[in-house]
Amino acid sequence: MSENSSDSDSSCGWTVISHEGSDIEMLNSVTPTDSCEPAPECSSLEQEELQALQIEQGESSQNGTVLMEETAYPALEETSSTIEAEEQKIPEDSIYIGTASDDSDIVTLEPPKLEEIGNQEVVIVEEAQSSEDFNMGSSSSSQYTFCQPETVFSSQPSDDESSSDETSNQPSPAFRRRRARKKTVSASESEDRLVAEQETEPSKELSKRQFSSGLNKCVILALVIAISMGFGHFYGTIQIQKRQQLVRKIHEDELNDMKDYLSQCQQEQESFIDYKSLKENLARCWTLTEAEKMSFETQKTNLATENQYLRVSLEKEEKALSSLQEELNKLREQIRILEDKGTSTELVKENQKLKQHLEEEKQKKHSFLSQRETLLTEAKMLKRELERERLVTTALRGELQQLSGSQLHGKSDSPNVYTEKKEIAILRERLTELERKLTFEQQRSDLWERLYVEAKDQNGKQGTDGKKKGGRGSHRAKNKSKETFLGSVKETFDAMKNSTKEFVRHHKEKIKQAKEAVKENLKKFSDSVKSTFRHFKDTTKNIFDEKGNKRFGATKEAAEKPRTVFSDYLHPQYKAPTENHHNRGPTMQNDGRKEKPVHFKEFRKNTNSKKCSPGHDCRENSHSFRKACSGVFDCAQQESMSLFNTVVNPIRMDEFRQIIQRYMLKELDTFCHWNELDQFINKFFLNGVFIHDQKLFTDFVNDVKDYLRNMKEYEVDNDGVFEKLDEYIYRHFFGHTFSPPYGPRSVYIKPCHYSSL
């Protein structure tokens, strides 16, 4: 179908519309009874059917149902079959007769019968239903609809009808055709025409055949339309699938785009964070580079100044070197002049004297070495004696063990078993003390031997140093004479001679001092060893004598005698010691440039002297003035080191008084003599510090103890209240109670002081 032409045909109600020119032909079935009268019933029925068809077609077009290719072909076949059936139903007698008026160019065809109209309506309804059943509507790409023929309502012609009656409002069921206006014909002429038409009935058959051929064309056209609709539907389904695929693709692309966008945003965030960190790192690097730049600039300036300073110093050194080279050349010239003159007789004599003096010194050294060898042999002899005494002690220990064993096997009911056990314990304690003493003496002998060797080595080093110093002094004198050019060669030799004399004199003095020190030390050592062993023998002899007396029924008073001996031995400061105990425990005394070992001199208290009383000054009876120490601090440290193996600072008065108060409160309920005791104590303190350089602290403690004992209130029935006062004081200041001044010396340990009141 084209835009300019559209043809439609059916058995009843088919309308063929052609826009070729301005003519319109309408064909309707005409009955012989109703040729020219309008049928209002038919027109109303046709209007209702047309309205229903239009509504159904609108709904079908709105629904836009889509048919597959399989349903298209049976729908076409059914439509073709219905058309053929309708053609057969049409009666042969039905002849389309048109009426024409002479006065107008409109030809009116008579409407068909009511039965035919009903059949046509049924066919139209079936076609509409089939179109709805088969969904022959429109696709998404192209829509095809079957349009029902529109009824043209024309006004009923009047007697005076003309061409202007077309605009009348009265509808007519007949179809009209507008033709070219002809001239008006008279009534006679119309009658002639009717006669002529009746004569031309055979020509109607030809028109019928032409109509059937037109109907066939319409059927073919409908088939073409159906096929085109099927193809359009198929093409529409393909397009829909393609569009769905496109939509899916679009959704997938959108999802991918969103994912890419999210990943891009995340990357941008990370890049932003990285950018921040890079920015911070760049700032740090910038600050570091700035600092390095500043340091480099400062170093550069420092190096420049240092370089300039070195240049100046180099120039000065070059000048000094040139001047020294000039002086050296001058000195060489002077030496050559002196060599040419030759050596004088005075120089030869001085050299001979120096050689003799050196030979004498060598002889003295040889004699000193021989004396040293003799002293070493004496030391070895003393060591042997020590070993013998040790063997004796071991033998005594064996005898003691035998005695203890025999006592255990003896009668346990005897009254003297308990006392014998006590004596055995005392003897064992004495033996342990003697062993300690022997070990200490052996260690001390080793110490003196080592000190002797060190003194000898130091003397040798000093001799070599003196020689070197003499050479240096002569060299300096020469340089001085050469530099000033005021001295002469004689002055240089005089300086050398004087320096060598001083060295020899100093060396002699050192050798004498070393000899005296070694002799004195060895003599004191041997005397101390002999006295200790003599004392050991006496004590052991007394012990065994006492043991024999006890066995044969000696009295209890005789048994108490060795205990006093042992107590005197444990506390030798209460007993008048021999001369061998004066110098025990080496100390170091400062002598010029070198420290030399000197024995510390212990001081004792005279047991025969009077005891301290409240009215007596104990400083008169004290022989504690120190000759080997200087100052309060030195004497306090020497006393604490020799007696307690610790180093203690001088004792303060307030601390000592607090200790006595604490002891009194602990042992006594009341003590009313604080003022008297303070007056007695104040005599031994100067500026709040004890006078260690005038009196031993142990003697002072014993004096305080005796002073408290001699008070009238505590002379009788004191129950030994003050017996442990000295131990309490020693424990506070020195960390332990008083012990004999032998045994190996320990490293300095600070005493643990108890908290004062």
Swiss-Prot record:
Q: Tell me if Signal is a UniProt keyword of this record.
A: no
Ranges that cross the membrane: 218-238
Family classification: Belongs to the CCPG1 family.
Amino acid composition bias (Basic residues), ranges on this chain? 175-184, 469-479
Q: Which residues form a coiled coil?
A: 248-272, 306-450, 504-530
Question: Where is this gene product found?
Answer: Cytoplasmic granule membrane
Q: Which PANTHER family match?
A: CELL CYCLE PROGRESSION PROTEIN 1
Q: Topology: which residues are Cytoplasmic?
A: 1-217
Record text on subunit structure and interactions: Interacts with MCF2L. May interact with MCF2, ARHGEF1, BCR, VAV1 and FGD1, but not with TIAM1. Interacts with GTP-bound CDC42 and SRC.
Segments of this protein annotated with the region Interaction with MCF2L and SRC: 1-308
Which regions of this chain are Lumenal-facing, per the record's topological domains?
239-757
Q: Where is the signal peptide?
A: none
Q: Which GO terms describe its biological process?
A: positive regulation of cell cycle; positive regulation of cell population proliferation; positive regulation of transcription by RNA polymerase II
**Region annotation Disordered: residue ranges?**
152-207, 458-483
Write down what this protein is called. Answer: Cell cycle progression protein 1
Residues where Phosphoserine is found: 186
Q: Name one GO cellular component term.
A: membrane
Q: Extract the InterPro entries matched here.
A: CCPG1/PBIP1
Compositionally biased spans, kind Basic and acidic residues: 190-207, 458-468
Function of this protein?
Acts as an assembly platform for Rho protein signaling complexes. Limits guanine nucleotide exchange activity of MCF2L toward RHOA, which results in an inhibition of both its transcriptional activation ability and its transforming activity. Does not inhibit activity of MCF2L toward CDC42, or activity of MCF2 toward either RHOA or CDC42. May be involved in cell cycle regulation.
The UniProt keywords, alphabetically, are: Cell cycle, Coiled coil, Membrane, Phosphoprotein, Signal-anchor, Transmembrane, Transmembrane helix
Natural source organism? Homo sapiens
Q: How does it sit in the membrane?
A: Single-pass type II membrane protein
- Specify the superkingdom: Eukaryota
